[in-house]
């Protein structure tokens, strides 16, 4: 396989390029969903939490965004490889959310990868286990590990299949 070439967004035109090119393209290939992490947590020996309701009645579920490389290739963006290479699952940092990774998602799509971003418990639109929306709390860090592994083995694997 030859070397991949992906052109970075020109910093002098960054805001304009993100607004006029990147975000509209991402919108066309984005799929939003909800992941029920209870099976993954039980499998890891962790009792599932119900989560405090805050979005659409999805008790305990985790929000995610996935970007399909086939749909991206169909819009024929300049610089896209149009060669499916697999899927990438992004695990965001503490107090972050999926959309923070829009630019990175763009580069992976250009390179031929589908991308999935799980919003961990207590982050973004995912279930929270405290009333204070400004506070990120988790009872056991292994819950994050179990949730991400379960997500990668199900949703991520679907996108990796192409």
Question: What residue spans do the PLM features occupy?
Answer:
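An N-terminal hydrophobic leader/cap segment in hydrolases
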Residues: 1-56, 63-70, 74-80
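Conserved alpha/beta-hydrolase
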Residues: 98, 103-131
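Glycine-rich phosphate-binding loop signature in dinucleotide/nucleotide-binding domains
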Residues: 81-83, 155-162
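Well-ordered alpha-helical segments embedded in enzymatic catalytic cores
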Residues: 63, 93, 100, 147-151
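Active-site glycine-rich loops that stabilize anionic/oxyanionic intermediates
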Residues: 85-96
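Alpha/beta-hydrolase active-site loop
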Residues: 136-158
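Secondary-structure boundary motif
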Residues: 72, 110, 157-161
């Amino acid at each position: 396989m030859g070397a991949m070439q992906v052109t970075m967004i020109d910093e002098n035109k960054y805001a304009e390029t993100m607004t006029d090119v990147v975000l509209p393209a991402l919108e066309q290939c984005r799929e939003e969903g909800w992941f029920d992490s209870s099976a993954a947590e039980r499998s890891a020996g962790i009792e599932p939490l119900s989560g405090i309701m805050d979005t659409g009645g999805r008790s305990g579920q985790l929000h995610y965004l996935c970007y399909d490389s086939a749909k991206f290739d169909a819009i024929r963006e300049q610089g896209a490889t149009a060669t499916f290479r697999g899927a990438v699952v992004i695990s965001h940092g503490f107090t972050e959310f999926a959309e923070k990774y829009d630019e990175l998602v763009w580069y992976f799509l250009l390179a031929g990868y589908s991308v999935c971003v799980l919003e961990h418990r207590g982050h973004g639109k995912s279930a929270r286990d405290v009333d204070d929306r400004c506070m990120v709390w988790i009872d056991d860090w292994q819950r994050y590990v179990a949730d991400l592994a379960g997500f990668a083995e199900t949703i991520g694997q679907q996108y990796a299949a192409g």
